[in-house]
Curated annotation (Swiss-Prot):
UniProt keyword NAD, yes or no: yes
HAMAP family: Aldedh_AstD (MF_01174)
Active-site residues, record numbering mapped to chain: E248, C282
Name this protein carries in UniProt: N-succinylglutamate 5-semialdehyde dehydrogenase
Gene name in the database record: astD
Annotated Gene3D superfamilies: Aldehyde Dehydrogenase, Chain A, domain 1 (3.40.605.10), Aldehyde Dehydrogenase, Chain A, domain 2 (3.40.309.10)
Pfam short name (any one): Aldedh
Molecular function as annotated in GO: succinylglutamate-semialdehyde dehydrogenase activity
Organism in which the protein naturally occurs: Colwellia psychrerythraea (strain 34H / ATCC BAA-681)
Entry-linked PANTHER family: ALDEHYDE DEHYDROGENASE-RELATED
UniProt cross-references to PROSITE patterns, sorted A to Z: ALDEHYDE_DEHYDR_CYS, ALDEHYDE_DEHYDR_GLU
Family: Belongs to the aldehyde dehydrogenase family. AstD subfamily.
Length: 492
């Protein structure tokens, strides 16, 4: 069946895709909620050209005029927050309590981005003899933005808002798993009064993404997603130093527990680190280090008890669940497969991760002890509620193993000892390091990013302003004049 729904937004016009049929389903109930056609290569080209045509006028209007449009978008977000939260929940399977928070974070992002623009990329003036020195910033031009499915509103919004404030124009390619959320977002930008071509939406799968990423007329690409895709983009951009590439990828994140008095508080933070958003946050704890002693045994026993009792359910249940569905049945089965492979290597199941309902993304959280097979464990991000358990005797060796990864996004220590945290902080390699807080907790008022396979030193959140504009250094005087002292060897 062919779907001529106008799901592409190019040069201010909604139009049907010219590619093949695609659809999006609610992963909790296996119901189709969106249908359309992918953007063709020609449509991607049209989107880039329209962004290129719109760039000069958008970049050259006053900052106040750009801010007015972005502020109007924030107002529309606030007015439509509940509807957007429902759409996010419907398409991702996340509980409504969580998607309401995501929609709220999208509203707050505008004020934070304005503050970041002024603090990090505003204009700085310094006096110097006979002149003034200025630091100003200019937008890059046309930027491609690739969004993920786990936070399909908040994370691309974290690229889009600062990029527009800086004066860039955009071609946005959302995850093919969350096209409906992207479409609702773009309708709000349209209502906010963005000029035609300033933001464009191209819906599609891998082919659409390749056509956009490889387009010669884009000046940069901002990506949030898997490490595998990020590495492909990095290779594709090699030899193009004139293009800005900002990558925010995943992590194989360690959470270490040492010498704690409040076991319930520790278990709470472990659960929030490993299983919130059904384990589908890039900052989720993938590796849990617990001491091999009596206290460690007590912590593990309580963790198993609490995890078994976590409520799993539909996003719209009146009594809201802790965990909803994963993004798809395919994603759920990939976690079941990952668990099976670890068991085949010799790991021991502490709590089985189970696929709960055929045709859906529902799984139960799992804990698997890998203490005896450390040398054989693949350095992979299992993007879901499956945490690998390491029992340890030596704190420094635990930190060594925590660092034994090519990733470097988030890490944390749960400990009553500040000295232990200071030691941990000094040695651990990650872009986000927390003490006695879940490692999934991050602030939009701080940078967000990792090292190694987790990113390319282009931190987002508050530091997104840095990759949305480039600095211009100027020395300026009102008229040309001879210096008081001539350079040796010159005569006038």
């Amino acid at each position: 069946m062919s779907h001529a729904n106008p799901v592409q937004f190019i040069n201010g016009q909604w139009q049907a895709g010219l590619g093949h049929d695609v659809s999006s389903s609610n992963p909790a109930r296996n119901e189709v909620i969106w249908q359309g056609k992918t953007a063709s290569k020609d449509q991607v080209n049209d989107a880039v050209l329209s962004a290129r045509q719109a760039f000069e006028s958008w970049a050259n209007i006053s900052l106040e005029a750009r801010v007015a449009v972005v502020t109007k978008f924030a107002e529309l977000l606030a007015e439509n927050k509940d509807a957007l939260a429902t759409t996010i929940a419907l398409e991702t399977g996340k509980p409504k309590w969580e998607t309401t928070g995501e929609a709220g974070a999208m509203v707050a992002k505008v004020a934070i981005s304005l503050k970041a623009y002024n603090e990090r990329t505003g204009t700085v003036e310094n006096p110097m003899p006979g002149a003034k020195a200025f630091i100003r910033h200019k937008p890059h031009g046309v930027v491609a933005i690739f969004g993920p499915y786990n936070f399909p509103g908040h994370l691309p919004n974290g690229h889009i808002v600062p990029a527009l404030i800086a004066g860039n124009t955009i071609v946005f390619k959302p995850s093919e798993l969350t096209p409906r959320v992207a479409q609702e977002m773009l309708k709000l930008w349209e209502q906010a009064g963005l000029p035609n071509g300033v933001i464009n939406l191209v819906q599609g799968e891998v082919e659409t993404g390749k056509a956009l990423a490889s387009h010669k007329l884009i000046d940069g690409l901002f990506f949030t997603g898997s490490s595998n895709t990020g590495h492909i983009l990095h290779e594709q951009f090699a030899g193009q130093p004139g293009k800005i590439l900002a990558l925010e990828m995943g992590g194989n994140n360690p959470l270490v527990v040492k010498d704690v008095s409040d076991i319930d508080a520790v278990v709470h933070d472990i659960v929030q680190s490993a299983f919130v958003t059904t384990g589908q946050r890039c900052t989720c704890a993938r590796r849990l280090f617990i001491e091999a002693n009596e206290q460690g045994d007590a912590i593990l026993a309580r963790l198993i008890e609490v995890t078994k009792n976590l409520t799993i359910g539909y996003y719209d249940d009146e009594a809201q669940p802790f965990m909803g569905s994963m993004i798809s049945e395919k994603a759920a089965l990939s976690l079941v497969d990952a668990q099976a492979k670890l068991l085949a290597l010799g790991a021991k199941s502490v709590l089985d991760l189970k696929h709960l309902e055929v045709g859906t993304g529902f799984v139960s959280p799992g804990i698997i002890d890998v203490s005896d097979i450390i040398a054989d464990i693949p350095d992979e991000e299992y993007f879901g509620p499956l945490v690998k358990l390491y029992r340890y005797n030596d704190f420094d060796k635990a930190i060594d193993e925590a660092n034994n990864t090519g990733f470097g996004l988030s890490a944390g220590l749960l400990s009553d000892s500040e000295a232990s945290y200071n030691h941990f902080f000094t040695r651990i390699r990650a872009g986000i390091v927390n003490w006695n807080k879940p490692i999934t907790g991050a602030s939009s008022a701080a940078p967000f990013g990792g090292i190694g396979a987790s990113g390319n030193h282009r931190a987002s959140a508050f530091y997104a302003a840095d990759y949305c504009a480039y600095p211009i250094a100027s020395v300026e005087a009102e008229k040309v004049s001879l210096p008081e002292t001539l350079t040796p060897g010159m005569k006038f």
